[in-house]
Design a protein with these regions (language model features):
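Transmembrane alpha-helical segments of multi-pass transport proteins
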Residues: 2, 250, 300-359
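Alpha-helical transmembrane segments of polytopic membrane transporters and translocases
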Residues: 5-6, 113-114, 127-146, 171-179, ...
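Membrane-interface junctions at transmembrane-helix termini in multi-pass inner-membrane proteins
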Residues: 7-32, 56, 77, 218-250, ...
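Helix-loop junctions and terminal segments of transmembrane helices
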Residues: 22-23, 136-174, 230-236
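Hydrophobic alpha-helical transmembrane segments
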Residues: 31-79, 91, 95, 102, ...
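Interfacial/gating helices of multi-pass transporter permease domains
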Residues: 55-56, 91-95, 99, 117-137, ...
Length: 369
């Protein structure tokens, strides 16, 4: 209860207000509140720890600090948005059940691997999966931060029917997200096994060195990140009902394929199920967004997606293979190799991204069918 207090406060009192703030392209408000809460929380934890306070009270203090965030969101919304009270009407949230269904499908997709490994494989493999998932999930969170405010921007342009500007901004976001994904995930592919080797040093309950599994799971998350602009367009256009089968199909494919492959190879099996399901959803959203929102050929989206995915896979596999023959004995060496890898991949990718962003404004006319 103590640990979950801040999350409870977020969903019970702050999520609607935060959604409104983000939709108005004021993500900086949330960032400022998050930074302030993190600083105050760090100071409070240090102070309570120095006072030798029990762990329960330390966690309670931390949760109470983060529980204040919804109140700040509420105060900001109340001051800047004079919202009238909505009467009873069926037009309000008319697609709420479809939205809930997609969230349930997403929840099933995200948790299928852990559940199946727990039920049908050695429980020790859950620990292996959790370590790799922790690292890759952190990289995914960093990548997703670059799409902040994207859906709100798309929604504004769709509402104003500014198709040319929507295409241009879509290609800019797509170029940025794909470039960031290629850099971060290819570096992660090269460095994740050496990191796990250091992180689990001295732990012998399971074999934590699983490079093939790591690359497959990494590709699944990378594909998911690269498709953020395409998956964000239907949400911005309020097309939840029209795209529901993409979410439902993703969950179904993941569950069915993972169940079929888990007896062949538990870790690789569930990772392949996740990757296949993610690719299906990505292609589905590319097809829908290209045809019904952007009005551009699917082939144009598929070519960029396939090229980026292939490049990422080659870089990650090559980096992983290269570092396998190098002894990395401590975190300092790992950081040095990480910086070298980031420089080698990041510099040319940054140049490509910069060049494409400059050219994007001239591609509007060529994107038409």
């Amino acid at each position: 209860l103590t640990i979950g207090l801040s999350t409870l406060a977020k969903y019970m009192g702050g999520l609607a207000n935060l959604t409104l703030i983000v939709a108005d392209q004021r993500q900086y408000v949330n960032n400022c509140i998050m930074i302030a809460a993190a600083v105050v929380n760090a100071a409070a934890v240090v102070l309570l720890t120095q006072l030798k306070t029990q762990l329960l009270w330390v966690k309670l203090g931390s949760s109470l600090i983060f529980a204040v965030r919804p109140l700040l969101y509420r105060l900001y919304v109340k001051k800047h948005y004079p919202l009238p009270k909505a009467g009873k009407t069926s037009a309000v949230l008319d697609q709420k059940w479809t939205g809930i269904g997609q969230h349930i499908a997403y929840f099933l997709h995200m948790n299928t691997d852990i559940v199946l490994l727990t039920l049908f494989a050695d429980v020790k493999l859950v620990a292996v999966y959790a370590v790799y998932s922790m690292v890759i999930g952190s990289v995914r969170a960093i990548t997703e931060s670059f799409s902040s405010g994207m859906e709100a921007k798309f929604g504004e342009l769709i509402a104003k029917e500014r198709l040319d500007r929507l295409r241009r901004d879509f290609w800019r976001y797509q170029t940025l997200i794909v470039s960031v994904s290629v850099v971060l995930f290819s570096c992660t592919g090269a460095l994740i096994v050496p990191f796990v080797r250091l992180y689990t040093k001295g732990i012998t309950d399971a074999d934590y060195i699983q490079p093939v599994f790591a690359l497959i799971l990494l590709m699944a998350e990378a594909v998911n990140c690269m498709m953020l602009p395409c998956s964000g367009l239907p949400a911005a256009a309020n097309r939840f009902r029209q795209t529901r089968w993409g979410a439902y199909g993703e969950a179904a494919i993941n569950i069915i394929l993972s169940c079929a492959l888990i007896h062949w190879s538990p870790l690789i099996g569930v990772a392949l199920g996740t990757l296949t399901a993610t690719v299906f959803r990505s292609v589905y959203y590319m097809a829908y967004s290209g045809r019904h929102i952007l009005h551009i050929p699917l082939s144009k989206l598929l070519v960029q997606f396939a090229a980026a995915a292939a490049l990422l896979g080659v870089l990650a596999a090559a980096g992983c293979r290269l570092l396998q023959g190098i002894a990395i004995d401590n975190y300092f060496q790992w950081v040095l190799w990480g910086l070298a890898t980031l420089s080698a991949v990041g510099a040319p990718t940054a140049f490509y991204c910069w060049k494409r962003l400059r050219e994007a404004k001239y591609e509007t006319d060529s994107d038409r069918e």
